[in-house]
A protein has these predicted regions:
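Outer-membrane beta-barrel signature, preferentially recognizing the C-terminal barrel domain
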Residues: 264-282, 315-317, 364-368, 413-424, ...
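Conserved C-terminal beta-signal and adjacent last beta-strands/turns
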Residues: 12-13, 193, 237-238, 375, ...
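Short acidic/polar hinge/loop motifs at secondary-structure boundaries
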Residues: 106-133
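Flexible loop and strand-edge segments within Gram-negative outer membrane beta-barrel domains
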Residues: 199-203, 222-228, 242-288, 292-319, ...
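Periplasmic-side early beta-strands and strand-to-turn transitions of outer-membrane beta-barrels
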Residues: 150, 158-160, 166-168, 180-268
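Extracytoplasmic beta-strand/coil segments of soluble accessory domains associated
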Residues: 59, 63-106
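Surface-exposed extracellular loop regions of Gram-negative outer-membrane beta-barrel proteins
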Residues: 255, 298-300, 346-351, 394-409, ...
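Gram-negative outer-membrane beta-barrel transporters
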Residues: 333-336, 378-386, 394, 496, ...
Length: 671
């Protein structure tokens, strides 16, 4: 458990010479605070940092955050079930949804399988990304077990008109184009953006994969491709200094095609539309806001055997969520936040089999209603801060399953409606006895993850494995306690260390159950108890006005504490991670950001089989750019590399490999 670890580019928001320059964060408490002034363990990536990073999507900019591991099994060639974010050991295995993803404060996880499709939003629409490590169900409800990722979109400019365009080209015929335009007219402002990312010719299947061997002659490596299109629109109207209305909508399309020499075969496609609105009013005594969001997703997955398309599995997911929040002060000591929230989701999926008469259809509906209360108590002129909070959640789900060989007279099973409730408390303490020289933090929180509709009523076939649902699943529960210290001996140097332990029960996992009809059967079950013990540390140093040094590290043990695999690790969760690097930015010279990240062993199943373990590799990246400013416009050519390694192949899992040594050249311009 003890690797010192250095601080990442992902948290460069903490790299400021003056404390007054620290960014504002809102996710930890739903109220505005400067970074480092909350009891929670928070990191931020700002817009300025994103523009300096060698990144293609949101996943890439979180790669070097402390306590955060990006399991990008197939990079931008992969789906959201293959590309995951793991926070404090949660979120890495094949059961999704232990890390909650928000957009502008509202959940954006799909109703069926509780994942966020990382390809649905372009980096050009992102203002900043806030990551809260540790349980957050006391504010946000289900799924906030390991932490919360809040993607905050860019607000339109308040005056004038601005436009930026960019393009880059690199290995595997990877090509990205993007556009962002914003303007303001009196009290009204707007922003529009669009992006395209294409790549062609990379084989995501490892050379050692049995499936690769059996299909080697049929593999269409020259034509396997991915295409990702994004578009977004933001509108804002400011009524006066105390009230405003903002609307943000986005559309995206992702396709991964051409893997085999099979006509009409699409490995995976995902089409998404989302729209959110927020009405805010400061009444003086009370600051209030109402937010609502709708997400609509359609996906399709094709399966194949050698040269034959064997099945297709289209799915449709719809989600509506809302939140009404109020913040008010009571005297000089108390700042209360009270609110109500809710969500509704619907999921429908089917599987059509072309080599048999079999047909499956499944789906369901879910409803969640909740209320939350939090008090930020400031004592002794802010030297002691205590933040208690609690949230009540009620949820109900109902579903159906049809699995038959008789399409004419199908046997459909309707499951009775089930409901559950959960109280989620938290308590945070921050002690600052010496004006930010040394700050002590400690947090206790309880969290939960309600079984998804896919867990309860779904299931799927992926390759040679068939995953079955279980309508009797219980919610996952966890309790976490952490203790941390922030040391700021000078304005240029900051050190943060946090240790934590999580006790979880009724963890859901896919348990192997032998074979059926030629498939490896895996059924979702509650495996009872899990503990995760870990430490995360980061350090950054502002050497001078232009040079910043950073490093971070994480070590943890995610352990199964009951059942047949007692004492073994949770699978697909790296147990060690370290990142280090620097940013040099001189307005008259150039900007260079470079970093390297090491991942330790990644167990592939619950048996701790070392023969099939992955991990133990370094990956580097850099971006070098130079900006030229002219009277009415600017130009910034750049070169960048991603996935730099000396290895022939990099794998997070046995079944996937990532594109490596990706070299890009590009140009951005603004006017």
């Amino acid at each position: 458990l003890g690797a010192l670890c250095l601080f990442p580019q992902g948290v460069l928001a903490e790299e400021t010479v003056s404390a007054t320059m620290k960014p504002v964060v809102v996710t930890a408490t739903k109220t505005e605070h400067s970074l480092g002034e909350t009891t929670a363990d928070v990191s931020v990536v700002t817009r300025e940092q994103i523009e300096k990073m060698p990144a293609n999507n949101v996943l890439d900019v979180m790669r070097t955050m402390p306590g955060v591991t990006v399991d990008s099994a197939r990079s931008f060639y992969g789906t959201s079930t293959q590309n995951k974010v793991i926070i404090r050991g949660m979120g890495g295995d094949d059961v999704n949804g232990r890390v909650l993803v928000l957009m502008d404060g509202l959940p954006v996880m799909t109703a069926g399988n509780n994942i966020f499709n990382w390809d649905t939003i372009s980096l050009d629409t992102v203002e900043r990304i806030e990551v809260v490590r540790g349980p957050a169900s006391a504010l946000y409800g289900s799924s906030a077990m390991g932490g919360v990722i809040n993607i905050i979109t860019r607000k339109p400019t308040e005056e004038g008109f601005k436009t930026t365009v960019g393009t880059k080209f690199g290995r595997y015929n990877t090509w990205q184009n993007k556009l962002y335009h914003t303007g303001a007219i009196d009290k009204f402002s707007y922003a529009i953006s669009g992006s395209m990312l294409k790549s062609r010719g990379f084989n995501v299947l490892p050379e050692h994969s049995p499936k690769t061997s059996s299909n080697r002659n049929e593999f269409n490596s020259a034509r396997e491709k991915m295409e990702n299109y994004n578009g977004a629109l933001a509108l804002n109207y400011r009524f006066d200094e105390t009230a405003d209305l903002s609307i943000h909508g986005e559309m995206s399309s992702f396709e991964n095609t051409g893997r085999w020499h099979i006509e009409d075969f699409n490995l995976y496609s995902n089409k998404h539309q989302g729209i959110g609105a927020r009405l805010h009013k400061d009444f003086g005594v009370v600051d209030s806001s109402f937010s609502v969001r709708g997400d609509f997703t359609k996906s399709d997955y094709d399966n194949a055997s050698k040269t034959v398309k064997t099945s297709e599995a289209p799915s449709r997911m719809r989600t509506v969520s809302w939140d009404q929040s109020n913040t008010f002060a009571l005297g000089d000591m108390h700042l209360f936040t009270v609110g109500v929230a809710g969500s509704w989701g619907k999921f429908d999926s089917e599987s059509n089999y072309f080599t048999s008469t079999r047909y499956t259809q499944k789906g369901g509906k879910e409803l969640n209603l909740s209320g939350y209360l939090q008090d930020e108590i400031s004592i002794w002129d802010g030297k002691l801060t205590v933040v208690p909070g609690v949230r009540y959640d009620y949820w109900r789900s109902k579903g159906y399953l049809q699995d038959t060989n008789d399409r004419v007279n199908p046997d459909k099973q309707d499951f009775a409606s089930t409901s559950n409730v959960r109280f989620s408390p938290k308590l945070g303490v921050r002690v600052d006895p010496w004006d930010n020289l040394v700050v002590f933090r400690s947090n206790y929180g309880e969290a939960f993850r309600a079984p998804t509709l896919n867990d309860l009523f779904g299931g799927s076939i992926i390759g040679s494995s068939r995953y079955k649902s279980n309508p009797d699943l219980k919610p996952e529960l966890s309790k976490t306690w952490d203790v941390g210290v922030d040391v700021n001996p000078t304005d240029r140097l900051t050190l943060n260390v946090t240790g934590y332990k999580t006790w979880a029960e009724d963890y859901i996992a896919n348990i192997p159950k032998g074979k059926e009809d030629g498939y490896n059967i895996k059924i979702k079950e509650n495996i009872d108890k899990v503990t995760i013990t870990g430490i995360e540390a980061n350090i950054h140093y502002q050497y001078n006005e232009y040079l910043k040094l950073f490093a971070e590290g994480t070590a943890l043990r995610p352990e199964i504490r009951s059942g047949a695999n007692q004492g073994n690790h949770l699978h697909n969760v790296p147990t060690r991670k370290a990142s280090l690097g620097f940013t040099f930015s001189h307005p008259d010279w150039f900007t260079l950001q470079a970093s390297a990240t090491w991942l330790g062993r990644i167990w592939q199943d619950q048996t701790d089989n070392g023969d099939i373990a992955e991990g133990n590799f370094w990956l580097g990246e850099f971006k070098l750019s130079k900006r030229f400013d002219y009277e009415r416009y600017w130009l910034e050519p750049f070169i960048e590399m991603q996935g730099i390694t000396t290895k022939d192949e990099i794998r997070y899992t046995n079944g996937s490999r990532v594109p490596i040594n990706m070299f890009f050249v590009g140009l951005e311009a603004g006017f």
